[in-house]
Each structure stands twice: as structure tokens, then as C-alpha cells.
Amino acid sequence: MKASGTLREYKVVGRLLPSAKNPTPPLYRMRIFAPNHVVAKSRFWYFVSQLRKMKKANGETVYCGLVHEQSPLKVKNFGIWLRYDSRSGTHNMYREYRDLTTSGAVTQCYRDMGARHRARAHAIQIMKVQVIAANKCRRAAIKQFHDSKIKFPLPHRVLRRQHKPRFTTRRPQTFF
């Protein structure tokens, strides 16, 4: 899978094709993070074939739909449990991110894993994503924002293009 652009969260439901031996096969549901619905269905069948004796050839996708965030305007802390294949083996990992949406946090996770561990998207398997309370956060990078009186410095930007335009009617504004 290529983790291109912002990933989206899909709910994919699939099952084996009904047969005389098994007329009502059980449904299997997964939360899949993928760039589009085609990749989401493909990842579903990849994971299901690892867990159960099912293949896309003798199965059907019952439902594949986009999952919308409940509150996309509220900043939340996300805990992500994942496993990934590195050059030396398979590792389990727990990571924390702050984001507005679940898919945004997972996208951050894919970018972060690529930067810190050189883990490609196809080698990463997201096992669980959960919104976690501020008092349950473990990572210092996330806990530093749990301050009600948090302050950020005002940037003082110096204009690099000083002679474009050379003559202008107002002084440069460097404080924002």
C-alpha cells in the first residue's frame, strides 16, 4: 500500500460466498485506513486471509464505506497500537498523537514511522486506534500540551525578499 495523501477510515465487511455446505457464512468487519476504497478492500482481503481461511476469489465484499469523525473540531489524544516489519524482524509498538481526527492521527503515524524507523506503509499494520484521556497519556511529547495556561511565542519573521518590490507604500510587517 502507498500511504499517499491523507488516509481515510473505511469500514469494510466481507464474508465467504454462500455454499450448500455453509448457506449463511459469518460476516467479518474491519476498520481499514487507506487512501481510497479500492485499496481499503484490498487491505481487508489481505488481513482476512491472514486470520481466516478466506480469499477474495471465494468471498464477497458486503459493504465498504467511509467512516466520518464524530467530533472533527475537537483536538483529541490518540493511542495507536501497531506492528511493523523492520530489517531485523517484526516489532509491536504503541504510539501517541494529537489530532482532530482518527484518520489524521493514523496518517501522522505512517509519516512518523517512515521518518524514524524507515518503515514503509506496506510493512505497517495498525491493530488498534483509541481516543485516550489526558491523564492516561504516557508520552512527554503529547503531555506537554496538557496545560490550561499554555503559551506560544509570537514569531518575528524577517522579510527575505527585501527588494521585491523595491519601492512600496508601506513598511514591512514582521510581527504577526
Swiss-Prot record:
Q: Name one GO molecular function term.
A: structural constituent of ribosome
Name this polypeptide is given: Large ribosomal subunit protein eL20
**Oligomeric state and partners?**
Component of the large ribosomal subunit.
Q: Per the similarity annotation, which family is this?
A: Belongs to the eukaryotic ribosomal protein eL20 family.
Show the GO cellular component annotation of the record: cytoplasm; ribonucleoprotein complex; ribosome
Task: Determine if Ribonucleoprotein is one of this entry's keywords.
Answer: yes
The compartments listed are: Cytoplasm
One biological process term in Gene Ontology? translation
The UniProt entry, under InterPro entries, shows: Ribosomal_eL20, Ribosomal_eL20_dom, Ribosomal_eL20_eukaryotes
General function of this protein: Component of the large ribosomal subunit. The ribosome is a large ribonucleoprotein complex responsible for the synthesis of proteins in the cell.
Keywords linked to the UniProt accession: Cytoplasm, Ribonucleoprotein, Ribosomal protein
Which PANTHER family does the UniProt entry name for this protein?
60S RIBOSOMAL PROTEIN L18A (PTHR10052)
